[in-house]
């Protein structure tokens, strides 16, 4: 198994599917920048961001769950990255977030979602989601995206992603955000990825 391969144990690679990698490449973090992974979870995308930053700059890995951040610790140790700073937050208005207002170059929001884009791997999800639960999630997603936008300096970048296929959790969230924040503009993912040869 890959998890027992010497190169994996040395931190030379992580296992991650394409859909999980793309948000990191869309964020395009650079060496020496200040970057926030707003909903870091167990840190798969965090590790990619840290590697793309060439282990320089400062990368904050925020999450509301101690358990998920605890799962990041061994992965972070294995990776050898020293630019990652995991921190538990209470919510998107936490003082740890507010103190970074206007100082951050790039923010990744991999928002909590219904997960309905992962039905192939998690077929039981379709029975656990309802219109009400999705509506509740969209309120949370919009609040997180608004909070993330306050962090970026002028000219910075925010990438919003979910693993849902629902318009309500994606296009509608982004459209409402752009209507509320005319100082932000939509950049086609294809243009960013093409520039990187992806």
Model-derived segments and spans:
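S-adenosylmethionine
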Residues: 1-198
């Amino acid at each position: 198994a890959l998890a027992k391969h010497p190169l994996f144990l040395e931190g030379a690679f992580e296992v991650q599917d394409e859909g999980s990698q793309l948000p990191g490449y869309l964020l395009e973090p650079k060496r020496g920048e200040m970057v926030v992974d707003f909903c870091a979870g167990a840190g798969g995308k965090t590790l990619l961001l840290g590697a793309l930053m060439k282990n320089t700059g400062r990368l904050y890995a925020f999450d509301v769950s101690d358990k998920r951040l605890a799962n990041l610790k061994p992965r972070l140790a294995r990776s050898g990255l020293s630019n990652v700073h995991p921190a538990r937050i209470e919510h998107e208005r936490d003082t740890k977030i507010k103190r970074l207002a206007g100082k951050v170059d790039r923010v990744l929001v991999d928002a909590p979602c219904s997960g309905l884009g992962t039905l192939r791997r998690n077929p039981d999800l379709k029975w656990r989601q309802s219109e009400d639960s999705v509506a509740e999630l969209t309120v949370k997603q919009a609040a997180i995206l608004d909070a993330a936008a306050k962090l970026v300096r002028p000219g910075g970048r925010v990438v919003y992603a979910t693993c849902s296929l629902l318009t309500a959790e994606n296009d509608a969230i982004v459209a409402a955000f752009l209507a509320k924040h005319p100082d932000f503009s939509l950049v086609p993912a294809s243009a960013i990825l093409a520039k990187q040869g992806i």
